[in-house]
């Protein structure tokens, strides 16, 4: 019995220690994971509404939030207005939010979605071949990847949050 208990304890340590060593959460925002070891992002590209390639290097020296979403995703629909309000927050000088659709939906469906939730700030971006979703190991949507001005992924929001939450806004201002 002692051997079984010891094996179980070791399994728990192996499963949970790596997650606590490499990341932490901002108190009160359960879906935000902050990396202690930031990850350098290699050059990536995706498509805009005009089907042109867009590259992260197009946004040098910007604090980026890549928000992965789809029109059929209810949590995406709920958080999108708070993302728009964050983008429009005058406290941020270098913030750029890029909502990237991974639902393989046509432009008209996306425009209707934006209209239905009163979104008028954002451009339309696509990850039609889901390369970015794979690169960032997305497990579901919405997921937002936060990239600092030096091109390092420093946090991830897994699921939805209120991007207008004062705790989140004040924390994010440190990176602007």
Show the residue positions of the predicted features.
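A short beta-strand-turn-helix
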Residues: 43-64
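N-proximal helix/coil linker or "cap" segments that precede and/or mark the start of modular domains
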Residues: 19-43
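Thiol/disulfide oxidoreductase modules built on the thioredoxin-like
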Residues: 112-120, 127-173
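Active-site acidic short loop of glycosyltransferases
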Residues: 59-62, 92, 119-121, 138
């Amino acid at each position: 019995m002692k051997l079984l208990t010891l094996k179980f304890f070791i399994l728990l340590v192996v499963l949970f220690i790596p997650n606590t060593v490499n990341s932490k959460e901002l108190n009160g925002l359960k879906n935000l994971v902050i990396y202690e070891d930031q990850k350098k992002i290699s050059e990536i590209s995706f498509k805009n509404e005009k089907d042109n390639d867009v590259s992260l290097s197009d946004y040098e020296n910007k604090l980026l939030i890549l928000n992965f979403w789809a029109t059929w995703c209810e949590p995406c629909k709920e958080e999108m207005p708070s993302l728009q309000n964050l983008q429009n927050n005058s406290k941020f000088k270098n913030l750029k939010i890029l909502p990237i659709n991974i639902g393989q939906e046509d432009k008209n469906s996306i425009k209707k979605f934006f209209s239905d939730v009163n979104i008028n700030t954002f451009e339309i971006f696509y990850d039609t071949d889901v390369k970015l979703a794979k690169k960032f190991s997305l497990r579901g949507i919405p997921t937002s990847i936060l990239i600092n001005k030096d091109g390092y992924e420093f946090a991830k929001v897994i699921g939805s949050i209120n991007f207008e939450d004062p705790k989140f806004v004040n924390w994010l201002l440190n990176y602007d």
